[in-house]
Amino acid sequence: MSLAQRVDSRIRPPFAEMLTSIPIGTLIAAVAASGLFAALQATLGSRGPLGRTNFTGEPIQTAGGLALVCGLLVAGAMDAALRPEIAVLFPFVIGGLLDDLVGTPAHKGFRGHLGALRRGKVTTGLLKIGFGGAGALWAAARLGSPHEIRFWSDTAVVALMANLFNLLDLRPLRALKAYWFAAFLLSPRSVGTLGLLLVGAIPYAGFEARRRVMLGDTGAMLLGAALGVCAIGALPVLGRCLLAALLVVLHVWAERNSISAFIARRPVLRAIDAFGWSQFTDPRSTE
């Protein structure tokens, strides 16, 4: 068996090797569960522990990614082969949900959370980083690579990809568009490994487009982690190292700059960002 085959067999998708390999009943049940959960959550407005106001001041439910989690749980209950791969993603879900429930915007970015720690305060954002780091280590270890550099580059890809999607989740559909686009940049085989989330996010997306729910840290970190796991299974070693370096650069840049402002100054990116939801509201470009 070649190295590529061994890696592929070890990582085997977070969700399945090919979309067509997922039993149709499992796929339908998972998508239905995601859509139903999103529909129920969308009726809550700003009520409950996950109630918030969005960037336009409208009532909204955060942690909409729980709808995707619900779909994964249903799929795992119906197909035992999916459970180990789904389990790898749950540290990211737990860390994100913790921040969605009790986190505050007082501290932002790595600098903000580390600065709070130096003052003796442990923020939920710092706990989220801890859960994400643990999840990334677990995901990288599942590949069984004996090479230390490759192990740490894989860990960085998964952890930083999860956090990057967290940074993107500031406008409706932005993180979902980035996820769909990035998934299709990978090989067709790798797109298949993301099939459950690719399809499961479709019914959810309608509610996010109407500003009833947002992914929150729960959903953004889930999508980013799933994409990161897929990337370290699909890309060669050099590609993974380059991706890790690119993610580091993006995070350093994002510590000092606004992603939303960057998009707003570029007409093409602004149009892509507004597509799918701007017809429902007047988009605002400031954070």
Model-identified regions with their sequence ranges:
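Membrane-proximal soluble regions of multi-pass membrane proteins
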Residues: 65, 247-287
